[in-house]
Amino acid sequence: MSGWHHRHILDLAAFSREDYAAVLDLAERFRSLPVTGARKLPALQGRLVATLFFEPSTRTRSSFELAAKRLSADVQSFSPSSSSLSKGESVLDTARTYVAMGADVLVVRHRSTGVPQQLAEDLESAGERTVVLNGGDGLHSHPSQGLLDLHTLARHFAPQHPMPEALQGRRIVIVGDILHSRVARSNLWALTACGADVVLCGPPSLVPDAFRAFVEAPPPGQSADPVPQRGSVRVERRLERALPGADAVMTLRLQKERMTQQLLTGLERYHRDFGLSHERLSLCGQPVPVLHPGPVNRGVEMTGALLDDPSICLVEEQVRNGVPIRMALLYLMAAAESAAESTLVSISS
């Protein structure tokens, strides 16, 4: 892993195809652990991973904690309801407390954009060795979700070699509340960097035209043409125009808790116009998988029948892929050398 250069993982904007390949390759090797009979690796033994989730979470938090434990790390969970935040302690001071306890990795989720980056900058200024992994911040980014979605699609398209090139030239349709979705933004960076063409579909109030130019500007520190054959982004207002020719469809939850004004006329109308069903998917012209980052609102983003159809819906596969992807990220950040490297080599041989 000598080519890995991301000390903190705050978003996917500056990830190269080589970075995506490194994560997916490790995740594939970690997926093989149950097959080999090994439930845990000593890769992060003696390391402390602290999950600082200032927002509710089921999948992401549990997945990160299980990933850390499977790498033999110690895990310390933070709960806002029983913390000193209720006594006026700041987020920064809370994070510093865990650093003082010896945390090697802080996995941070917060409703405000930029909090993980602020913590990373504070740690750098203080000369601390602790690294920050963004578990989701505001509307900005959810890098591990973008990576596990990429992994899920790569495994679907190329199960024998699920690497970034499996997405080259694929058409991925993302439907729903793009405006309030950090998942959508992370998927846009990951999918287009790997050569997929993305179609965003939803009403103007939830999919502003500004998203057409989402990937036109080069990522920070890269040239104007950083990735060969980078994918495109286009916006459609009707599912009937978005779905034909699709290779996969991702639908997103309506994030009513983040909506500051009335952006929808009603859930029934939304489902009528943008809800997925078996019948609607026939417009793709071929069998396609359906993804959703969860939690799913049955009968809104998709029908219950579609959600319960394992031949089409990959929601549970996304959850399964979350653990090896997060194992890969924790490994790359905290133990990309010495004994952990030799452990991985022995597994892959």
From Swiss-Prot:
Residues given in the record as carbamoyl phosphate binding sites: 59-60, 109, 142, 145, 294-295
One annotated Gene Ontology cellular component of this protein: cytosol
GO biological process, one term: 'de novo' UMP biosynthetic process
Key words, A-Z: Pyrimidine biosynthesis, Transferase
Reactions mediated catalytically: carbamoyl phosphate + L-aspartate = N-carbamoyl-L-aspartate + phosphate + H(+)
Binding residue positions for L-aspartate: 87, 182, 253
PROSITE patterns given in the database record: CARBAMOYLTRANSFERASE (PS00097)
Presence of the UniProt keyword Cell membrane in the record: no
Molecular function terms, GO-annotated: amino acid binding; aspartate carbamoyltransferase activity
Enzyme Commission number(s) of this protein: 2.1.3.2
Pathway(s) of this molecule: Pyrimidine metabolism; UMP biosynthesis via de novo pathway; (S)-dihydroorotate from bicarbonate: step 2/3
Family assignment from sequence similarity: Belongs to the aspartate/ornithine carbamoyltransferase superfamily. ATCase family.
Subunit structure, as described in the record: Heterododecamer (2C3:3R2) of six catalytic PyrB chains organized as two trimers (C3), and six regulatory PyrI chains organized as three dimers (R2).
NCBIfam families (UniProt xref): asp_carb_tr (TIGR00670), PRK00856.1 (NF002032)
PANTHER family: ASPARTATE CARBAMOYLTRANSFERASE, ORNITHINE CARBAMOYLTRANSFERASE, MITOCHONDRIAL
Function comment: Catalyzes the condensation of carbamoyl phosphate and aspartate to form carbamoyl aspartate and inorganic phosphate, the committed step in the de novo pyrimidine nucleotide biosynthesis pathway.
Record's protein name: Aspartate carbamoyltransferase catalytic subunit
Biological source species: Parasynechococcus marenigrum (strain WH8102)
